[in-house]
């Protein structure tokens, strides 16, 4: 996936990937933490929620931060609170997300972060292995 960014500037390494799943898996493997900036695309929200979900599942133990400039993420945080109040999100899972209105405050909070929620599944491996006798895709296909 290659999308031109408005600024035209590149920071760090640019890596071309085939799809969103590969993009998220690559970010999860290589990132020390995750920060959601103000996004103009659904991809920002989708990636954010997947990183929160992976933390809850125990796939990673990295900080997930929201740079909440001018209250941009207030409605999302209120949605999470409602999920807890209604019993759809466990109280401990609220600790997965760290939020602050400035980059400096967010970095300070993220540096202090330690996972305190209970995982709902055991740690998963990033490596994919064939199951039993099932052939991999395109294997043993009639020519």
From Swiss-Prot:
Any GO molecular function: cytokinin riboside 5'-monophosphate phosphoribohydrolase activity
Catalytic activity reported: N(6)-(dimethylallyl)adenosine 5'-phosphate + H2O = N(6)-dimethylallyladenine + D-ribose 5-phosphate; 9-ribosyl-trans-zeatin 5'-phosphate + H2O = trans-zeatin + D-ribose 5-phosphate
Principal EC category: hydrolase
Protein origin, superkingdom: Eukaryota
InterPro entries: LOG_fam
E.C. no: 3.2.2.n1
GO cellular component: cytosol; nucleus
Record-listed substrate binding positions: 23-24, 41-47, 53
Disulfide bonds: none
UniProt keyword list: Cytokinin biosynthesis, Hydrolase
GO biological process, one term: cytokinin biosynthetic process
Family: Belongs to the LOG family.
Role: Cytokinin-activating enzyme working in the direct activation pathway. Phosphoribohydrolase that converts inactive cytokinin nucleotides to the biologically active free-base forms.
Name the UniProt record assigns to this protein: Putative cytokinin riboside 5'-monophosphate phosphoribohydrolase LOG9
Species in which this protein is naturally found: Arabidopsis thaliana (Mouse-ear cress)
Lineage: Eukaryota, Viridiplantae, Streptophyta, Embryophyta, Tracheophyta
């Amino acid at each position: 996936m290659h999308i031109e960014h408005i600024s035209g500037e590149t920071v760090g390494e640019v890596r071309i990937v085939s799809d969103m799943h590969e993009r998220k898996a690559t970010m999860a493997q290589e990132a020390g933490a995750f920060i959601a900036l103000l996004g103009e695309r659904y991809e920002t929200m989708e990636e954010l929620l997947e990183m929160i979900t992976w933390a809850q599942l125990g796939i990673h133990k990295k900080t997930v931060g929201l740079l909440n400039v001018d209250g941009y993420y207030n409605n999302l945080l209120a949605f999470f609170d409602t999920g807890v109040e209604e019993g759809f999100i466990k109280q401990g899972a609220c600790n997965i997300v760290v939020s602050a209105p400035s980059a400096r405050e967010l970095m300070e909070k993220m540096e202090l972060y330690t996972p305190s929620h209970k995982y709902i599944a055991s740690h998963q491996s990033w490596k994919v292995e064939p199951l039993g006798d099932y052939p991999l895709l395109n294997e043993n296909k009639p020519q």
